[in-house]
């Protein structure tokens, strides 16, 4: 049975502290497991970076000062900026230099990546598997972003955040999530049902809740909640992009969970066909090679 911890804010007034029930947080639509509610907030520097990049009149000096305010965070950004993950040809030795060369959207992508790595902290094989899927999805988003008329950096940031709910559940409820993620299923919908059976919430809804709780941009919330939904005419362009990239990441060899009805690569790229015109879709082996090479940056 899933364990919970007492949230004193939700304790009935009539009960003394020592007899307080252990309860989850219940919203209008779903019950959120209380350990998920008690996860530490998203990295403060990354949150400020996300907020500042929405300001068209942003002061670049202020932007660099925010990042430089945490020397360890700034060092991690420079490490990734100089790594094979992003593949920039020139070495960058300071945050302001990096901002000048890379631009705000790429720095935002780097900041979110650093924050996500820090959020994971201790890693085991399943955390590693989930993280690789998130990064693979982000890299595929970047690769196919031009098809959707998005910048590669903006697409990458959306992709790397899409599974924050699964990572959050695994971090807060490892005992309950490990059997779910180690199982074999017919399809993704069966995985989501298994998560709900174990924790009363699936990772899609959990991710949407975390984004709102951390006051991150709302487009991330839509992506987290609906990236496993069937394509819909009302989907935003960014959501369509992430849906396609998530399936492509699974198809080229980076699934989180094994499913019998795993989409083939041709099935995964089929939503791109109307947008391609005379252009050719990227080859599966090329995508796999690129993602594998760039993922190596995280193992160094």
Question: Predicted regions span which residues?
Answer:
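Short helix/strand-capping connector loops at secondary-structure junctions
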Residues: 263-278
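Conserved alpha-helical "signature site"
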Residues: 1-181, 185-266
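C-terminal accessory extensions/subdomains outside the catalytic/core fold
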Residues: 276-279, 283-299
């Amino acid at each position: 049975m899933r364990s919970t911890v007492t949230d004193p804010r939700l304790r009935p007034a009539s009960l003394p502290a020592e007899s307080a029930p252990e309860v989850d947080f219940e919203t209008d639509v779903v019950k959120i497991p209380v350990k998920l509610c008690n996860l530490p907030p998203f990295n403060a520097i990354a949150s400020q970076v996300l907020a500042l990049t929405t300001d068209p009149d942003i002061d670049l000096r202020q932007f660099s000062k925010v990042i430089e305010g945490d020397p360890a965070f700034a060092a991690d950004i420079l490490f990734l900026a100089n790594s094979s993950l992003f593949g920039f040809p020139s070495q960058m030795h300071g945050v302001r230099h990096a901002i000048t060369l890379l631009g705000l959207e790429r720095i935002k992508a780097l900041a979110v990546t650093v924050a996500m790595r820090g959020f994971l902290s201790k890693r085991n094989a399943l955390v590693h598997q989930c993280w690789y899927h998130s990064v693979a999805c982000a890299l595929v988003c970047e690769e196919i972003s031009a098809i959707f008329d998005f910048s590669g950096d903006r697409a990458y940031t959306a992709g790397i955040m899409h599974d924050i709910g699964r990572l959050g559940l695994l971090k807060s409820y490892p005992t309950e999530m490990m059997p779910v993620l180690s199982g074999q299923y017919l399809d993704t919908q069966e995985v989501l049902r298994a998560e709900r059976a174990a924790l009363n919430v699936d990772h899609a809804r959990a991710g949407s809740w975390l984004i709102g709780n951390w006051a991150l941009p709302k487009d991330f919330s839509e992506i987290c909640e609906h990236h496993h939904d069937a394509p819909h005419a009302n989907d935003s362009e960014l959501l369509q992009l992430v849906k396609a990239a998530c399936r492509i990441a699974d198809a080229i060899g980076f699934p989180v969970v094994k499913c019998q009805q795993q989409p083939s690569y041709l099935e995964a790229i089929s939503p791109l066909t109307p947008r391609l015109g005379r252009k050719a879709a990227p080859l599966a082996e090329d995508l796999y090679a690129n993602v594998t090479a760039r993922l190596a940056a995280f193992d160094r």
